[in-house]
């Protein structure tokens, strides 16, 4: 069964479930992407979050709330998608923030 499509207030960004439409086409390793499928967020487990925190810590990151950091969110996004972390690291700033916010909002029950 299809879930509802959401139109964000400015009218130009449409999302379906946990599929994030990019603000402009993004080239990664010779392929053009117009969306990021984060539907795997529904399958994330606490052990994935623990592992993401370890990866975040080993990279030198520190935060009292690591779930709010972009790097942590990208580790989770990698686990929730078919994309490598380099895919997320290469996103334009606006789309990178939208991915981070999507993951963060998912954790805190706002997605």
Regions found by a protein language model. Give the residues of each.
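Short, surface-exposed, charged amphipathic helix/loop patches that serve as local interaction elements
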Residues: 2-111
